[in-house]
Amino acid sequence: MWIENKIFQEDMENIAQAAYIPWEQLMHKTLFITGATGLIGFNLISALAYVSLYKNIPLKIIALVRDEEQAKERFQEILATEAPLKFVVGDLENIPPVSERIDYIIHGGSPTASRYFAEHPVETIMINLKSATHLLELARKNQSDGFLFLSSMEVYGGIHCREKVNEKHAGFVDTMVPRNSYPEVKRMVESLCACYADEYGVPAKSIRLTQTFGAGIRKGDNRVFAQFAHSAMQHEDIVMFTKGGTERDYLYTADAVSAILTVLLSGKAGEAYNAANEEAYCSIKEMAETVANLDIIKEKYNGPVSVVIDESKNDGKMYPPELYMDLDTKKLQQLGWNATRNLKEMFTRMILTMV
């Protein structure tokens, strides 16, 4: 998949060419990354390896992984090069000691499935809180140059009217709902980052990512955007288990990587930044209809296909209530960042890397 794929190689080159990313700050630096084998982590590590190999930005990447063999498979094409990537085997609850000085930490590891939040709320809280505390301590002891926590738009809670949501928006989260373990602990970790910045001088920041997808998804990815694409590619109806009324922005994987690096290197310590493509705002149903009618689905997969709503399997626990999440990204844009891919492009490029 890596740079042998035209789409993925183009993504890596676009990230490397982003003039607003101060790449020189990463020269001869070591980055510690969690969530390495996930969609965002994979794209992030790929981009860092790319600039190291092809853009004369010497750096080191240390990735925390649970299963070294699976990680080797995930990154096999990168490992076949001279890319400066090595693995530390452990999990978020038991992060092993790292002997090298760590200059930057990007904490992207976390459970991400709604079903997991609902069925394992205690573990959701403890894994996030323990891992963040451990890594912030690591940053403090190393006097690291930067720490970035990958947070979520879910920290804003349920917003039931259409309005722009900036970083100062105070949304409501019902703490008595177990599934809300996820947004609540994300809020707590954001606060912890701000506190470490204030009390200990750790340059910790948070980035609130909207739902992100694009090149680099795994074959078995079961998230909604992947389900929609798989159904359309197999010429099957796209079946939804809610009315799909929730509206939000989306973000392409490469745009997420450039946003992460921008906040890590140029963001202000103790602050949070929204990351989304404001032009890719739509309902889940509208997103499904977009996929069903993509040109690539018509041309290569005998499309279009139909969108069907079947709420018979929805017990009300697995899906958050209908809401609106239109993130305001002016604060991030002031650092020079901008999104580059619209919704149709996101899906088209994702599908072209799934083939």
Description of each model-found segment:
Residues 1-4, 232, 236-355:
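C-terminal substrate-binding subdomain of Rossmann-fold SDR/epimerase-dehydratase oxidoreductases
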Residues 1-104:
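N-terminal Rossmann/SDR dinucleotide-binding element
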Residues 34, 64, 105-108, 147-153, ...:
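SDR active-site strand-loop-helix element
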Residues 89-127:
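NAD(P)H-binding glycine-rich loop region in Rossmannoid oxidoreductase-like domains
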Residues 111-115, 153-160, 210-213:
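Active-site segment of SDR-like NAD(P)-dependent oxidoreductases
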Residues 159-168, 191-248, 253-264, 284, ...:
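NAD(P)-dependent short-chain dehydrogenase/reductase
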Residues 181, 185-188:
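Active-site helix of classical SDR
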